[in-house]
Amino acid sequence: MRILATDMDRTLLPNGHWPADEQAIELFNSMTREHDILVVYVTGRNQALTEAAVEEFGVRRPDILIGDVGTSIRKYENGGWRFDEGWTTHVREASPRWDAEAIKALVAGIEGLREQEAEHQNPFK
């Protein structure tokens, strides 16, 4: 099995004022399909933002999405996304004292620091 893991923004896709390279995206899509390459996006984006980029730029949907700044792993199977429960279990067991609320309280007084919106949160973020 061949695997290609890539970031999305400013690596595979533009982010900012640069235009998308449609020819490069078409080549990426065709080569990864033609050579049966498992595609993994490793990104700070959540699932919704990843899907929006797939739609906007015409890049292929990944087989695996390591998203939310590495705090979630999803697999695309049978027409839908599902969490990799093995990863969730691993993180939970490897960090049994993880307490997001305690961390929030600890950093609450830092000026300029703000939490992301609720839709971008998960138990490990």
Regions from the language model: what does each represent?
Residues 1-18:
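Asp-based phosphoryl-transfer active-site loop
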Residues 2-5, 24, 39:
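Membrane-targeting and insertion segments and their boundary/processing signals
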Residues 17-29:
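Conserved N-terminal helical subregion
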Residues 26-118:
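Active-site phosphate-binding/coordination module
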Residues 121-125:
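Extracytoplasmic ligand-binding site segments that recognize negatively charged/polar headgroups
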